[in-house]
Amino acid sequence: MKVLGIFHKPSLKSVAEKFSEILFDENFHVEYVGSEIPSIEVDLTLVLGGDGTFLKAAHKVRNPLVGFKGGRLGFLSSYTLGDFDKFLEDLKNENFERDIRYFLKAGDFYTLNEVLLIRDPVQKMVDIQIFFQDGDFYFHADGLIISTPTGSTGYSLSLGGPIMLPNVNSFVITPVAPQFLASRSIIVPDDEEIIVRIDQEINLILDGMDFGKVREVNLKKSRRRIVILRPKDYNFSKSIKEKLGYGKRFL
């Protein structure tokens, strides 16, 4: 890989420029450095920022991505900003594993983390019905979130949803503030086509982006995917222990 791009959140401009200088000195060509992604083909995009910045990049590029944590948690990042020397060695030696993540298609749109269907603050609770191959489920709630394994450590987790390993071929469906205590998350295989119908229009939010109001949405796994480059010593279990304290031995 010789041609690189660097996409960064605005506050990390000086760090991105420093990375670019180092890469140039190491005979790598950096095609662009910026907080916007131009229509230029590169071999690898470096993403400096948090998971939100990484998601923006994932929606705009088709080449492999490698993230540098410049936010709070950075589940999608492979390195910290202080790990650049290690990244440079891995880049020279092509010492990477490919971590493939698939998008979820919601109607005509795509999402990497989750689909959030949520009422307005002054709107009454909604009736939601979910249809899939084996039947249907009903919820009376403020909304619904359908998460990919990638998104399972995000908003879905804060609603009580499970953590899914990245290679699990499933989605998790979790109601938002349901009326009934028994309304819990359900995991469905990702080869299912899911239809969600609501009794009134509510907001459709994909990866934090507002796509207007809907009363029905069809969901299915997309063939569209991204490739995240990870160092060969990357370990997802270690990552969630460090970032969330999950499964960590305290005594």
Curated annotation (Swiss-Prot):
Q: Which reaction does it catalyse?
A: NAD(+) + ATP = ADP + NADP(+) + H(+)
Q: Which biological process annotations from GO are given for this protein?
A: NAD metabolic process; NADP biosynthetic process
Matching InterPro entries, A to Z? ATP-NAD_kinase_N (IPR017438), ATP-NAD_kinase_PpnK-typ_C (IPR017437), NAD/diacylglycerol_kinase_sf (IPR016064), NADK (IPR002504)
Pfam families linked to this entry: NAD_kinase (PF01513), NAD_kinase_C (PF20143)
**According to the lineage, what is the superkingdom?**
Bacteria
Would I find Glycoprotein among this entry's keywords?
Answer: no
> What is this organism's lineage?
Bacteria, Thermotogati, Thermotogota, Thermotogae, Thermotogales
Name of the protein described by the UniProt record: NAD kinase
One of the record's GO molecular function terms: NAD binding
Its main subcellular localisation, reduced to a broad class, is cytoplasm
